Amino acid sequence: MVKLNKIYTRTGDDGTSGLVDGSRAIKSGVRLTAIGEVDEANCAVGLAIAELAALTGLPDLGRIQNELFDLGADLATPFGTDFEAHALRIVAPQVERIEREIDAMNADLAPLASFILPSGSRAIASVHLARAIVRRAERAAVALAAAEQVNLHALAYLNRLSDHLFVLARVVAARDGGEVLWQPGATRGD
């Protein structure tokens, strides 16, 4: 367990932040942008958990929050360092478990007949918001991967997680009054 006795260190006052291997990276760089986006995604998943508290039988989003923390640690550990052998990395079984959860949730849903809007209730919208923020985290991680070596399972995890949240939002909508379908301009009568 990590113990933090002091929250501020002043070491980041120069615009850098420490990585797992002890090196420092600029806060506006691609690595820390990706780590920050994953942190924001984790917060959005936490908001979704709060909104879904009254519903039962849903996948364990608390586990996903822990895995997003792991993913941030993964991105904070550059490849090719002495710390790599002990790095916390996202692994294929984590991605595969998310895929199984997607398949299980999707099995009970009607096929999509239209694009759906991220609305209908606070719970539905909160899951869609988390999905969109996870997509942004994925784009930031892909930008990091274009610049430096990253764990490809971490990229796959983010990609699947956004799909997972999309299907979860559909499950919540099915329990919570139905999906709000997109009506293209010509069909709205505007």
Predicted regions mapped to residue ranges:
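Phosphate/pyrophosphate-binding loop motifs in nucleotide- or prenyl diphosphate-using proteins
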Residues: 1-190
